[in-house]
A protein has these predicted regions:
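N-terminal beta-strand motif that seeds the catalytic metal site of vicinal oxygen chelate
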Residues: 11-40, 90-93
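Core segments of cupin and vicinal oxygen chelate
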Residues: 30-73
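Vicinal oxygen chelate
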Residues: 33-37, 88, 92-136
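A short beta-turn/loop motif at secondary-structure boundaries
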Residues: 56-58, 84, 120-121
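Active-site beta-strand termini and strand-to-loop segments that position acidic
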Residues: 66-70, 129-132, 141-142
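Short, charged/polar surface micro-motifs in flexible loops or helix N-caps
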Residues: 69-74, 82-84, 100-102
Length: 142
């Protein structure tokens, strides 16, 4: 009898099951940091992120989870043990904004370090900035 169920489990039923178990979003991204206090100041004061959680994780670190305005994905300022070499490198993620020129000007005024002024490409306009830990990020608009 189980064989009949498995054999007949095709088409619409299978598609519905697959949709139910599929990954639906990125919950958070972890940004490696050397100094959590310095990084927290940067992300809240310069980028305008808000604190969701700031609690002890272990003897060395806290679990600091931040909200990006108008975004579901959260940012975690946390470095897994053994991943310290990632601090100060290019991050394989990018931030999106509505107006790159306005965002660039406002963040530069707040003291954010940029590698260059926004550059226009066929896929959009972008620039690179560094956080307090030397991590490099792309920020772009269409």
């Amino acid at each position: 009898m189980l064989q009949d169920v498995v054999v007949r489990w095709t088409g619409k039923e299978r598609a519905n099951y697959v949709r139910c178990i599929m990954i639906k979003q990125i919950k958070f991204v972890s940004i490696p940091v050397a100094d959590q206090n310095r990084a927290l100041d940067f992300y809240t004061e310069k980028l305008g992120f808000t604190i969701i959680t700031d609690q002890p994780f272990d003897e060395k670190q806290r679990w600091i989870e931040l909200r990006i305005p108008k975004a579901e994905t959260r940012v975690v300022l946390f470095t897994p043990e053994g991943d310290e070499k990632r601090i100060g490198t290019f991050m394989n993620m990018s931030y999106a904004c509505d107006d790159i020129d306005k965002t660039y000007a406002e963040l530069k005024e707040r003291g954010v370090e940029f590698e260059s002024a926004p550059q226009k490409e066929p896929w959009g306009t972008y620039t690179l900035f560094k956080d307090s830990e030397g991590n490099r990020f792309v920020v772009s608009s269409d």
